[in-house]
Amino acid sequence: MKFSPAHYLLPLLPALVLSTRQDYEELEKQLKEVFKERSTILRQLTKTSRELDGIKVNLQSLKNDEQSAKTDVQKLLELGQKQREEMKSLQEALQNQLKETSEKAEKHQATINFLKTEVERKSKMIRDLQNENKSLKNKLLSGNKLCGIHAEESKKIQAQLKELRYGKKDLLFKAQQLTDLEQKLAVAKNELEKAALDRESQMKAMKETVQLCLTSVFRDQPPPPLSLITSNPTRMLLPPRNIASKLPDAAAKSKPQQSASGNNESSQVESTKEGNPSTTACDSQDEGRPCSMKHKESPPSNATAETEPIPQKLQMPPCSECEVKKAPEKPLTSFEGMAAREEKIL
């Protein structure tokens, strides 16, 4: 019954490592051997007890041999003590072995617990890694989407670059055209400057003739001869309707040069208006009608006016050179506008 703790510990050790099992098997073998030795010793003791009984029975017969028997008994007692001492030593050895096995079992349990904690920690690490893998997969998917978007944008940019290259070629071609146009414009400007000089001289001559005509009409004086106006027959005076329409254009272009002549004309016109009230109607009313028609309706003031020819009735052919030189001004403005627009675009 003293070996019961070992029997209680044996069913608790199936979870140990194979090394512990081997140790237990060795211990069990040793215990079996010890039990066998004990059984043999017990048998021997029983035999000795039987022998003692037989000796006691035979004491009477062996009184003579008491001394020899005593010596034998003492020997047997000594042997029994020795056997008891041996049994005690064996029990102590078994107890020490049981303690060692219990300590080993505790160590194995500690290792098992440590392994369990490590397994739990590693499982947590695995879960964390799985979560990180999921997040990385999501990031990869988003990165792939962004890569697709960037690829589409790069394709668009490449298409735009191709368009810009073609646009550069077109711009170079247009620049060459612009250089040609600038050269043509320079030539046209030179020609227009020459034409403007001729036109200014013609306008001055026409203004002088108009002034003379107006002064002669308003003051009932005969007009000067036509030879003083122009030498060429092609450069004849325009009719008053054309003169009235063209005078503002010429005045707008030559304001700084002809300010003094304009002041003189205004003073002369005011003086003539005071003399003849019919001229105010010519200036204030319908500008489209010629002044000669309005002047006819007014009665003649002197007899000399009837005999003298009326200058307004003389309708001279328009100056063809003035009209021809007036037309190139519009292309000039259009060319200048086109050049300015193309410069802004560049």
From Swiss-Prot:
Region (Leucine-zipper): 164-192
Transmembrane segments: none
Gene Ontology CC: extracellular region
Major place of residence: secreted
UniProt keyword list: Coiled coil, Glycoprotein, Secreted, Signal
Keyword Coiled coil annotated: yes
Coiled-coil intervals, chain numbering: 16-211
Record field: compositional bias (Low complexity): 250-261
Signal sequence, start to end: 1-19
Polar residues compositional bias, start-end: 262-283
Protein name: Leucine zipper protein 2
Native organism: Homo sapiens (Human)
Gene this chain is encoded by: LUZP2
